[in-house]
Amino acid sequence: LGDVYKRQNPQRNEVGMAEEKTFLIKIITPERVFYEGTAIMAEFNTSEGEIGVYAGHIPLTVILKPGVLTLTEESGKKKAALHTGFAEILPDQISILAEAAEWPGEIDIKRAEAAQKRAEERLQAHSSDTDMARAETALLRAVARIEALR
């Protein structure tokens, strides 16, 4: 029975645990392939909250919210600002289609802080012509950029 299970589930052992500790991850934005490589774990924000993904994760499709992406590779951790989009999670890979993604070296801290201040002012003003959802998203993006630098 164990041999049958292994043939049907080559990525898992007899007790259903993932044997492979890394998985493929590809992050694509309209401008470029932002990242393509292997990771031990990926953490990012979804519309349902923060998620941490390891190899062998159940298949899942999620909507991304702006936040910090943390990739744990065998050589260490990498952080980036990840904006809205979608992620398809499979047991051996993650595919992320994002509106934008930025490494810390690509982020202008002064610009991000100014964007955060503007978004907070728009949200506090409660003006009838303010698109609240758009202002909230702008605030989340600015905070993600700042957090990715920490």
Feature-to-residue mapping (PLM):
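Short, small-residue-biased leader/transition segments that mark boundaries at the very start
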Residues: L1-Y5
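Extreme N-terminal tail/first-helix region
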Residues: R7, R12-E31
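Residue-identity detector for glutamine
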Residues: Q8-Q11, Q93, Q116, Q124
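A ubiquitous, low-specificity "background" feature that marks scattered single residues
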Residues: V15-A18, I94, T137
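Intrinsically disordered, low-complexity segments enriched in polar/charged small residues
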Residues: G16-M17, V62, T70, S127, ...
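Compact, glycine-rich, soluble single-domain proteins
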Residues: L24-R118
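Acidic/glycine-rich phosphate/pyrophosphate-binding loops and surrounding catalytic core
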Residues: A101-R150
